[in-house]
A protein has these predicted regions:
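Active-site and donor-binding regions of nucleotide-sugar-utilizing enzymes
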Residues: 1-4, 8-101, 105
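Short, glycine/polar-rich helix-capping loops at beta-to-alpha or helix-loop-helix junctions
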Residues: 13-19, 176, 235-240
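Donor-nucleotide binding loops and adjacent catalytic segments primarily
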Residues: 14, 127-206
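A nucleotide-sugar donor-handling region in carbohydrate enzymes
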Residues: 81-144, 174-176
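Acidic donor-binding loop of glycosyltransferase active sites
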Residues: 204-215
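Catalytic binding pocket for nucleotide-activated donors in carbohydrate/polymer assembly enzymes
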Residues: 217-264
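A short, well-ordered alpha-helix in the C-terminal region of glycosyltransferases
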Residues: 268, 274-289
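C-terminal alpha-helical cap of glycosyltransferases
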Residues: 288-309
Length: 309
């Protein structure tokens, strides 16, 4: 799509995302009226929706304009109107249509697109004696699983001489409190990164991670990092890639943080390297490198079809 202008249309509620996108020199439009009106005002040759479940009315307006549409992570009522739906975070359909999904619905990790930074990153080699762990939860992390996880495992890491990396996203709601808390802990092996631009670098040299069940688990699998996964809500719980057969110790939905259970699983994986190695070996058989080309190829076919019509 190098010969096309690319615009990002962000909803009124996505000002943080809009500012991050604009900072990368992309043309950005903030929603002014109805979202479909703002999209059609750009007279696009193709629309790519990355907004989770699409409303049917929104999609009907786009299709009435005869514009090809590609949706990502869409299980909503509007998804059936898309020309292609890429649901990489779901291993199988969640809402079936007449018992069968159309072929234009692409499900599972074989369609997960790695960010380019991970293609250059150095994948981790298994170490029986772990030297570094990673704690990372996406989104705003309103329950502050980040701090609760840190308080659970920090004493265990301290007594074993294991370094800790804590990484939060730009929407993390407890940044100032966490900075003060980390300073009070006084652990020289503890590092905090807020809204890092190069996540792959934070994963290099990591032996075990504790995280939520979002897109990060795919990046962890690519980097060969066995992980303890805490789903933050029902939608994340449906991301079934983050299970034992792909190298993850899945703890279910954490409606109430269970420090004792987390501590037990953490100690098992830290102190029993053979258990961690089983998860590591399963991840080493997973490959995402060619997925982006498959997905982009489908998008380019839709663009070509639009030009020929």
């Amino acid at each position: 799509i190098a010969n096309h202008k690319v615009f990002f249309v962000c909803t009124k509620e996505s000002e943080l995302a809009a500012s991050n996108i604009a900072a990368r020199d992309y043309k950005t439009v903030i929603q002014q009226g109805e979202l479909w009106e703002d999209v059609l005002a750009l007279d696009p040759d193709l629309v790519i929706n990355d907004m989770l479940d699409t409303p049917r009315e929104y999609m009907e307006h786009l299709k009435a304009a005869n514009i090809p549409v590609v949706n990502f992570e869409d299980e909503g009522p509007g998804s059936v109107l898309a020309d292609q739906v890429v649901n990489a975070l779901y291993e199988e359909p969640q809402n079936e249509t007449n018992g069968k999904q159309p072929e234009r619905f692409l499900y599972g990790h074989k369609y997960f697109c790695l960010r380019d930074e991970f293609l250059q990153a150095e994948q981790n080699v298994f170490r029986p004696a772990p030297k570094c762990i990673l704690i990372t939860f996406g989104g705003t992390d309103m329950p502050d699983y980040t701090r609760q996880t840190l308080d659970t495992v920090e004493p265990l890491c301290r007594e074993r001489g294991i370094a800790i990396r804590v990484v939060t996203g730009p929407g993390y709601a407890h940044r100032d409190e966490l900075v003060r808390h980390i300073k009070a802990l006084g652990n020289p092996l503890l590092r905090f990164e807020y809204a890092t631009n190069i996540m792959s670098r934070m994963m290099e040299g990591v032996d075990l991670a504790i995280c939520s069940a979002g897109r990060t688990v795919y990046e962890l699998a690519h980097m060969h990092i066995p992980s303890i996964v805490l789903a933050q809500h029902e939608r994340e719980a449906r991301h079934t890639f983050a299970r034992a057969d792909h190298g993850f110790a899945y703890m279910g939905i954490m409606r109430k943080f269970n420090a004792e259970r987390l501590r037990k699983v953490f100690v098992e994986l830290i102190d029993e390297p053979e258990r961690r190695n089983v998860l590591y070996q399963r991840q080493s058989r997973i490959h995402f490198e060619k997925n982006k080309a498959k997905v982009v190829s489908g998008i380019l076919k839709l663009l070509k079809k639009e030009k020929e019509s």
